[in-house]
């Protein structure tokens, strides 16, 4: 059994710092790097890209709605052409920086509201899928495990990897509990670590309503910007190793 560990990185903006990139990068196998639309400035993004290359971490484009003020967490009703152009712009920008650093973008993981919206909105999902195919049909799409997007993207010809979240609570339908609700984000490192192992071995987790919810995940997202993120990431990695679950990139395994 193996699993990939990913994290959202490159999200600092000028003097405003977000996350713990230097500490999280040695733990993960895939880096979802901001592309400037929800967070990240060119210099900071390039530094994160170079560090990822140095550590042999796979680079992915963390594309978003154009929403710096809302950190990409606000829904936006964009036209199909707008969304396609936005996604193309972001992938190509990050891929250019990756090329300079001696690497390339190998997958796309939408961020925040865009991620949640295309999990169920077929029209916006189609725009994102088409943008990825226009740029490079070999790119892998990271999608919420169990969502309609997984099948939609596969039917469209994309390689898809299903993702689960280590520190997020789930509704019984497999969707993420809104961050606005109490209990949406989990903070107990030991509990989260054992929950990740249980999820992988048993194929699901207990929802916020106490119902077993099936989740088949190929990659686990570790958030680097929450309280205790470093301790939690280390605990998760240690628990995976303890249970003989290999940690390796999902690229070429999608």
Swiss-Prot record:
UniProt-listed InterPro entries = Glyco_hydro/deAcase_b/a-brl, LamB/YcsF/PxpA-like
A GO biological process held by the record = carbohydrate metabolic process
List the Gene3D superfamilies hit by this protein, alphabetically: Glycoside hydrolase/deacetylase (3.20.20.370)
Molecular function in Gene Ontology: 5-oxoprolinase (ATP-hydrolyzing) activity; ATP binding
Name the reaction it catalyses: 5-oxo-L-proline + ATP + 2 H2O = L-glutamate + ADP + phosphate + H(+)
Q: Which PANTHER family match?
A: 5-OXOPROLINASE SUBUNIT A (PTHR30292:SF0), UNCHARACTERIZED PROTEIN YBGL-RELATED (PTHR30292)
Pfam families on file:
LamB_YcsF
* Keywords attached to this entry: ATP-binding, Hydrolase, Nucleotide-binding
What is the similarity comment for this entry?
Belongs to the LamB/PxpA family.
Function comment: Catalyzes the cleavage of 5-oxoproline to form L-glutamate coupled to the hydrolysis of ATP to ADP and inorganic phosphate.
Record protein name field: 5-oxoprolinase subunit A
Describe its partners and assembly state.
Forms a complex composed of PxpA, PxpB and PxpC.
Q: What's the Enzyme Commission number for this chain?
A: 3.5.2.9
Domain of life per record: Bacteria
């Amino acid at each position: 059994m193996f699993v990939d560990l990913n994290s959202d990185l490159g999200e600092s903006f000028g003097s405003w710092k977000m996350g713990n990139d230097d500490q999280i990068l040695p733990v993960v196998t895939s880096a979802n790097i901001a592309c400037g639309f929800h967070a990240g400035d060119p210099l900071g993004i390039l530094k994160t890209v170079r560090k990822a290359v140095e550590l042999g971490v796979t680079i992915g484009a963390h594309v978003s709605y154009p929403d710096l003020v809302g950190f990409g967490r606000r829904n936006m009703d964009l036209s199909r052409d707008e969304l396609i152009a936005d996604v193309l712009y972001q992938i190509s920008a990050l891929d250019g920086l990756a090329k300079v650093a001696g690497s390339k973008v190998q997958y796309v993981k939408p961020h925040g509201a865009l991620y949640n919206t295309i999990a169920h909105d077929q029209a916006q999902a189609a725009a994102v899928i088409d943008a990825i195919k226009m740029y490079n049909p070999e790119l892998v799409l990271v999608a919420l495990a169990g969502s309609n997007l997984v099948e939609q993207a596969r039917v469209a010809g994309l390689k898809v990897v299903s993702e689960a979240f280590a520190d997020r609570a789930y509704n019984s339908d497999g969707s993420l509990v809104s961050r606005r609700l109490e209990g949406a984000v989990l903070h107990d490192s030991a509990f989260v670590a054992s929950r990740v192992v249980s999820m992988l071995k048993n194929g699901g987790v207990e929802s916020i309503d106490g119902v077993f919810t099936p989740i088949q995940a190929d990659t686990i997202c570790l958030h680097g910007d929450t309280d205790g993120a470093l301790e939690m990431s280390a605990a998760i990695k240690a628990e995976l190793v303890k249970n003989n679950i290999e940690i390796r990139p999902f690229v070429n395994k999608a």
